[in-house]
Amino acid sequence: MTLRYNSPAVQLSLLALTLLLTTAVRRLLNSFLMHEPPNNINLTYDSYLPTSIISCVAGFAGIFLANLAGIRSILLFYSFTSILYLSSIIVVYQYDHYTFHTACNIINSAAYDLSRVATLVVVLAYPNERWKARALATFLILEYFAMTMGNIIAISDHSSENSRLHSTIAALCLACLSPFVAVAIAPTHDVVRNNGVYLIARKTTLRDEIKETIRLFKNKYMLLLLPYMFCYPFLFGVAYIPFPNIEAIVLYDVGRLIVVFTSQMLDVQWASRRTRGLMALLVTSIFCTASSILTIVMRRAHMDLSGIKPSWGETEILAYVMDIALSEYAALMYATYFFAGVASSSVEFYGFWVMGTLTNDLKASARFVGTFHSVMSIGGLIGIELVTEIPHHYTTSNSLTYIAFGMSLISFMVLFVVVQSITESNDWTLGRMRNSSAPDTLSSPDGSSETVAVIAEVKYQHHNNV
């Protein structure tokens, strides 16, 4: 079959190439270039509080910008901020001046969160139902793989500063190509599925977006999804398991690749979509429970802390504890990292997939995805801020871990109600906009369903305004 420029496959390929030139380059080289090795498995927050707050706000801002400015505009903005960020690293190497770098880092971090919302909205909307989960897993793994390689490079590298400068220049040259790819991405209302039906893309205004976003928090699905969004990142935050070495990082990142298995379970047509969703929920719950139990066992493991000196700071105490854990509980510790990777990616992947099953409307999808992204960041940030107030929290405090574990179990039970509402078509938003004067649905061979009356009402093309 000949690929059309406005087909989902071509547009997703352009999106992937844009992310390779921006997100992948930064994830691959950031720690290496700035001498910042990873220090914690909770990747839903930034250890720098102001940047974390900006990240949370950017997720919510993505709701409005994805719908008002469009996907292409967000990706163009992200491309230019990536160029600025890499340029700021060159400034650091040449002039040892960090003010410009700090400003560019904050702007680029905000742009990254905006682009992530836009990317997930598109990835959930463009593929047909038989490829939705696998497309989502592919884009997540693209980011995971780049982050894994970047972490390995950062820890194992002993390059000179001159070599790092040359690497930065090469990365900047790659990033400079990203705006040309981003500008080639078609507007969402021009994308046509393989059944000949345009994607649902409604005109909107800022006033409408504010009103609909407020209404979103009265929607039963969003209210039921909120605990799931918050609880597991919160558990990661309060558990606080640092990376002791490169092996732990590799095991954690290998564990995150398990989403490939889950995506196959969700996409292969062996049962109804609701049944597949329930089975994936069970598998995700098992992964998360196993990870939580291993984390609790690891934190409760007996360690001789008599060697800790009163003059030591948090860094020295942490290094001492990690050395004991690696010498006495290495197998348990590595298993904890592996299942932590499995659980973290499974929670994120499954949450976004559930949202993709609720609606084919890109505007509603952006509101769900933006909220999910920000609430996850808030959960992780609150968790880590709570435990850092407790002295030696990684050895002496488990009460918050127990509470967070209980909260996460309850959130899975609540999510069960949402999954029970999944149908073979994404008819939640469409049902609210149905026009009874026209035929109900148009089925497609890929298993999706579109409401003809809605498409006739909400589809708009740029030539209509000419």
What are the roles of these predicted feature ranges?
Residues 1-25:
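Cytosolic juxtamembrane N-terminal segment immediately preceding the first transmembrane helix
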Residues 57-96:
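Conserved MFS/SLC helix-loop-helix module at the cytosolic interface between two early adjacent transmembrane helices
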Residues 140, 165-185, 283-291, 398-418:
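Symmetry-related core transmembrane helices of the 12-TM Major Facilitator Superfamily/SLC fold
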Residues 1-3, 191-213, 425-466:
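Non-transmembrane, juxtamembrane loop and terminal tail segments
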Residues 8, 12, 25-32, 197-369, ...:
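Membrane-interfacial loop- and helix-cap regions that link adjacent transmembrane helices
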Residues 48-56, 108, 112-116, 127-162, ...:
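Glycine-rich segments within core transmembrane alpha-helices of 12-TM secondary carriers
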Residues 15-23, 52, 86, 101-113, ...:
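Helical-face signature of the major facilitator-like transporter fold
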Residues 72-73, 156-173, 273-279, 384-408:
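A membrane-interface helix-boundary motif in multi-pass transporters
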